[in-house]
Design a protein with these regions (language model features):
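Phosphate-binding/catalytic loop of phosphoryl-transfer enzymes
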Residues: 37-167, 278, 282-302, 307
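ATP-binding/phosphotransfer module of carbohydrate and carboxylate kinases, centering on a glycine-rich
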Residues: 1-37, 52, 76-80, 104, ...
């Protein structure tokens, strides 16, 4: 079962908790959900998640939440464990188990939406860093003299290639493209994507600039992490080669040839559900790793985890 609803997660914690509870209830009431019992609930957050204290949220990224996840009542209602991780980490997990990363143990997943983050699989496991902040590529400063970011830095990647940054850039460039389908309108990310796919010069300019900024950040990532696959997910992944061609070009010109030659850069085939698939996969993986936490699961003794690929 699949349910979705847009909501201002960053600014409305109480509303977010209510929406999550409502969507859980709708999914579990759907005909497709009837059958085996619920094992657990996986939750993806647009924020770093400290694996040592997952209920304590980042004061920088989600300041209104007052460092409190507050989802215990949902887990208690259904009597199952709640597992939590960063959304980009879960996108990476989904790609590793079910998608384009299924043939490697080292991959990066870049989620480009309202925010920008990266999730990493290293040696077959999610890499979270010491306190869960690994992968915050959206707050790499691309232009130190650029726009002020919510994190307090200037010129962060998210201000240049995140949803709001794209919309603002389209507005800044509109006067140069009077014949654009976007001219004279409030250009949403969806409208910019549609324009770029149709060959509109303003839409293409905005996407080309965003691809260059993303490519600069990904080039650094390739030099440091050396993944075999980089999967682009989030809102922009449906652009395909319109995004990937300029992005790959920037990466090639800004990284070591040995790093870029070892990496494929692709758009996700799991689509908009990749993070949700990753959240469900985290439940499965957690149950396989420690069945004592999941009393409703009967797991046979043996080797568990993703099946090895030929």
């Amino acid at each position: 079962a699949w349910e979705t609803q847009d909501h201002p997660v960053r600014t409305d914690p109480a509303g977010t908790r209510r929406v999550v509870a409502e969507l859980c209830a709708k999914c579990l009431a759907a005909p497709a959900a009837q059958g085996p019992p619920l094992v657990g609930i996986g939750l993806a957050l647009p924020s770093p998640v400290d694996p040592n204290d997952p209920n304590r949220l980042s004061q920088v990224v989600l300041p209104v939440w007052q460092e409190n996840l507050g989802m215990d009542s949902i887990a208690a209602k259904y009597g199952v464990p709640l597992v939590v991780d960063n959304d980009a980490n879960l996108g990476a997990l989904a790609e590793y188990w079910w998608g384009l990363g299924s043939t490697t143990d080292n991959l990066a997943y870049i989620k480009v939406a309202t925010g920008i983050g990266s999730g990493h699989i290293i040696g077959g496991e999610i890499y979270r860093g010491a306190t869960g902040v690994a992968g915050e590529i959206g707050h790499v400063s691309i232009d130190p003299q650029g726009k002020l970011c919510v994190c307090g830095l200037r010129g962060c990647l998210v201000t240049l290639a995140g949803a709001r940054g794209l919309e603002e850039r389209a507005g800044e460039l509109a006067a140069r493209y009077p014949r654009s389908s976007l001219h004279g309108k409030r250009a949403t990310v969806h409208a910019i994507e549609e324009a770029a796919l149709a060959g509109d010069p303003l839409g293409l300019q905005v996407i080309n600039e965003a691809a260059a900024h993303l490519g600069t950040a990904i080039a650094g990532l390739l030099n440091i992490m050396n993944p075999a696959v980089v999967v682009m997910g989030g809102d922009l992944c449906r652009l395909g080669e319109v995004l990937l061609a300029p992005l790959r070009e920037r990466v090639r010109s800004h990284t070591l040839i040995s790093s870029v030659s070892a990496a494929e850069i692709l758009t996700s085939e799991l689509g908009p559900r990749s993070v949700a698939v990753g959240a469900a996969t985290l439940v499965l993986k957690s149950a396989l790793d420690d069945s004592h936490l999941f009393p409703k699961v009967d797991i046979p003794v043996g080797d568990h985890g993703r099946e090895p690929q030929p």
